[in-house]
């Protein structure tokens, strides 16, 4: 009770400081995770039923503090997962796979192998099958690859599989070289298209996966141990057979690729008893130190980020959610607690650069300090000078996908934001997020490479002179002028 009172006071101070804004329209039910859709809306999952999903959209001025909620459908019967793999596809659809828990399960863990795909245009869910031979998926790591394929790891094995977004068919990938099973590991997409992970079972080893070769290889030791020992000394049942018993290897914290090419990796509790401060480590993915790990600072206050969240702020700093509820910020040199702010729930990075934190009745927007380096922004090269409501257009440029996936949560419920949004603002200050889709890449830090996406102009948009921006990871391009015409072309 004392901790709850302390947290309540901290939230009150945060609201008073101006760093945090409380939503005027709170969620109709408690939500447990959030994903940014390509039309600027936020998809959330009901904490109560776990089958029902909602979308939250900003108001006419683009203000996320004064938006509206609407229910947008339910998963298929028998599938109400908690802690699953997830991501947006390049065409704008949303995919989920597995689930550590599922409503109505017979065992302590369910590790279900079900899945589903959400179509944001039709607002419908379609059941998704599992890779051949995968009896269990659970809370598995996943990532969208630069070529648009969805890569999923099997929690209980070294297995990996690709989902073809066009056919929604799975193909078993090579897992050659994988040092341990995928359980509790998080995957971080690097600029060269490879995936970095810090092992949990085989800690402090780290590994790199190359989709081009289908091989894993060691990325060396993380120097400090980032994983915590499991509190469950006995295995946990997830199926009817005697062998269907899971021995957890422990937990680890989230990892974020920063604009300078370093990956800030956070740890869970340290020490054999799991009661020490979490460690951190920095991986250099480019430059003269490429492929090297160095130890970072320990968490202040004896805290840690085991199975928690991290967000890349537009400033390039990493916001980390401590297990205590405190927020910490890594700026590349120092790791300090954030004053006048508190972690109230799962986060999502918004196109405004704000960070929404979900809570049952106190969902807030965190306003991070600082601003991005101008060189990190998307740059528009070619675009339609005139657009018509209801029509689709192509826009090209550079760095449309940002410099990082920008979001991380341990080993499951991935919600990266490395895809372009197109925002149109008219002379009256009304903001319209178009729906983008069919991005040419889902990579990160694409540099001077020419990339593109398509955007659907809303049918409700007002005619007249307007500005258009491309936004990635909360960082907007320089605006360009367009004309919204009512004439059909």
Descriptions of predicted regions:
Residues 53-60, 111-121, 159-165, 205-214, ...:
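Beta-propeller blade signature
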Residues 31-34, 82-87, 138-142, 184-187, ...:
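Beta-propeller and closely related beta-sheet repeat lectin domains
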Residues 12-27:
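A short helix->beta-strand "capping" segment at the edge of beta-propeller domains
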Residues 50, 66, 83, 109-112, ...:
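A detector of repeated loop/turn-to-beta-strand junctions in beta-rich toroidal repeat architectures
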Residues 23-32, 39, 43-45, 51-64, ...:
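Immunoglobulin-like IPT/TIG beta-sandwich domains and homologous Ig-like subdomains
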Residues 36-39, 88-91, 144-147, 189-192, ...:
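Residue-level detector of Asp-centered blade-edge/turn motifs that repeat once per structural unit
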Residues 341-376:
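Blade-level signature of beta-propeller repeat domains, shared across WD40, Kelch, NHL, RCC1
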Residues 42-44, 95, 150-152, 195-197, ...:
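Conserved beta-propeller blade signature
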């Amino acid at each position: 009770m004392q901790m709850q009172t302390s947290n309540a006071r901290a939230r009150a101070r945060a609201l008073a400081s101006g760093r945090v804004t409380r939503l005027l329209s709170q969620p109709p039910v408690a939500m447990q995770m959030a994903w940014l859709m390509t039309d600027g809306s936020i998809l959330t999952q009901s904490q109560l039923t776990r089958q029902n999903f909602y979308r939250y959209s900003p108001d006419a001025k683009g203000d996320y503090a004064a938006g509206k909620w609407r229910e947008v459908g339910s998963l298929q019967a028998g599938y109400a997962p908690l802690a699953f793999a997830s991501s947006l596809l390049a065409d704008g659809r949303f995919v989920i796979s597995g689930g550590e828990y599922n409503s109505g399960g017979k065992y302590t863990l369910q590790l279900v192998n079900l899945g589903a795909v959400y179509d944001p245009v039709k607002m419908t869910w379609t059941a998704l099958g599992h890779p051949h031979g995968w009896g269990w998926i659970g809370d598995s790591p996943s990532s969208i690859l630069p070529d648009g394929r969805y890569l999923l790891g099997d929690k209980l094995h070294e297995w990996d599989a690709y989902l073809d977004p066009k056919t929604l068919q799975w193909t078993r990938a090579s897992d050659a070289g994988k040092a341990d099973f995928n359980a509790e590991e998080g995957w971080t997409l690097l600029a060269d298209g490879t995936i970095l992970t810090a092992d949990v079972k085989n800690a402090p080893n780290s590994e790199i996966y190359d989709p081009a070769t289908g091989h894993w290889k060691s990325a060396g030791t993380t120097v400090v141990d980032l994983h915590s020992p499991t509190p469950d000394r006995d295995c946990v049942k997830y199926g009817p057979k005697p062998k269907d018993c899971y021995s957890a290897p422990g937990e680890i914290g989230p990892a974020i690729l920063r604009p300078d090419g370093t990956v800030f990796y956070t740890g869970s509790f340290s020490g054999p008893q799991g009661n020490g401060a979490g460690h951190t480590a920095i991986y250099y993915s480019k430059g003269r130190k490429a492929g090297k790990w160095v130890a970072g600072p320990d968490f202040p206050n004896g805290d840690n980020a085991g199975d928690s969240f991290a967000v890349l702020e537009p400033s390039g700093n990493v916001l980390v959610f401590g297990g205590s509820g405190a927020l910490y910020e890594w700026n590349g040199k120092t790791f300090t607690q954030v004053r006048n702010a508190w972690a109230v729930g799962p986060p999502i990075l918004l196109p405004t650069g704000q960070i929404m934190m979900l809570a049952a009745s106190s969902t807030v927007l965190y306003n991070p300090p600082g601003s991005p380096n101008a060189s990190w922004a998307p740059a528009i090269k070619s675009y339609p000078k005139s657009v018509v409501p209801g029509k689709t257009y192509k826009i090209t440029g550079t760095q449309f996908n940002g410099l990082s996936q920008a979001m991380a949560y341990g080993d499951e419920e991935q919600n990266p934001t490395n895809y372009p949004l197109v925002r149109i603002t008219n002379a009256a200050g009304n903001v319209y997020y178009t729906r983008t889709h069919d991005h040419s890449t889902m990579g990160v830090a694409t540099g001077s490479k020419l990339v593109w996406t398509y955007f659907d102009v809303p049918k409700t948009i007002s005619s007249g002179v307007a500005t258009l921006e491309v936004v990635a990871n909360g960082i907007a391009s320089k605006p360009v002028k367009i004309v919204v015409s009512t004439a059909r072309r």
